Amino acid sequence: MSIHAGGLQVPVSVIIPAAGSGRRMGGGTAKQFLPLRGEPVLVRTVRRFSECPLVDEIVIAAGDVEATRALVGHMPKVTRIVQGGAERQDSVWAALQAVHSRPRIVAVHDAARPLLTADVLKGVLQAAADHPAQVVAVPVQDTIKQVGPDGVVVATPDRSMLWAVQTPQVFWADVLVRAFRQAIADGFLGTDDASLVERIGVPVRVYRGHPGNLKLTTPTDFRLAELLLEEEARQC
């Protein structure tokens, strides 16, 4: 359907980097292929976007292209599955080059976050129509300590100013492309896409998300996700 920005209908592309090995899960299967209540994690993640009327296309950067195509290539709005890279940043860049060339908004979302709610997705996409960089985030609940290499606390940041960043992270396409090109030129490797955009001086805004939008990293995360899905099913 696209969204309205500046009086124009702007197509929305979603990039899902899915080339991770999931080493922290143990075993030989990448976490995006592991079952979660009877369905692979990646299937659940892709469905969250394919069912969103604001999304026009989904591009996936995969470690195993053929296995990924067999799993989700038939799903609505999946237009391309490209080879991912050694780092997450490499995978996002590969997918970014594969999106359609029309002016658009690009949302980048972790393959291992299958619990994104429809309300948060719709809200952050609509917010991005008016601002070139939006990231889903939640306020931190724990006290955070900055610790030096010797294990001694250096500082205690003001918790009221700290947010835990999730995905999707949503950008105007030209801004994201410029940020990636600058990072490549500088040899910079960021921990998320927003850090690249911050480096080129574009303000990044937070859109309040939901704590249940977990990134599945450990077996404990999977158990918690199963409980959240059970609760979601009871509410339907």
Swiss-Prot record:
One of its GO terms (molecular function) is 2-C-methyl-D-erythritol 4-phosphate cytidylyltransferase activity. The record marks 159, 215 as: Positions MEP for the nucleophilic attack. Keywords: Isoprene biosynthesis, Nucleotidyltransferase, Transferase. NCBIfam families: ispD. PANTHER family: 2-C-METHYL-D-ERYTHRITOL 4-PHOSPHATE CYTIDYLYLTRANSFERASE, CHLOROPLASTIC. The keyword Transcription does not apply. It catalyses: 2-C-methyl-D-erythritol 4-phosphate + CTP + H(+) = 4-CDP-2-C-methyl-D-erythritol + diphosphate. Catalyzes the formation of 4-diphosphocytidyl-2-C-methyl-D-erythritol from CTP and 2-C-methyl-D-erythritol 4-phosphate (MEP). HAMAP family: IspD. Pfam families: IspD. It is an enzyme of class 2 (transferase). This is 2-C-methyl-D-erythritol 4-phosphate cytidylyltransferase. Belongs to the IspD/TarI cytidylyltransferase family. IspD subfamily. InterPro entries: IspD, IspD/TarI, IspD/TarI_cytidylyltransf_bact, Nucleotide-diphossugar_trans. Transmembrane segments: none annotated. Its EC number is 2.7.7.60. Pathway: Isoprenoid biosynthesis; isopentenyl diphosphate biosynthesis via DXP pathway; isopentenyl diphosphate from 1-deoxy-D-xylulose 5-phosphate: step 2/6. GO terms for biological process: isopentenyl diphosphate biosynthetic process, methylerythritol 4-phosphate pathway. The record marks 24, 31 as: Transition state stabilizer.
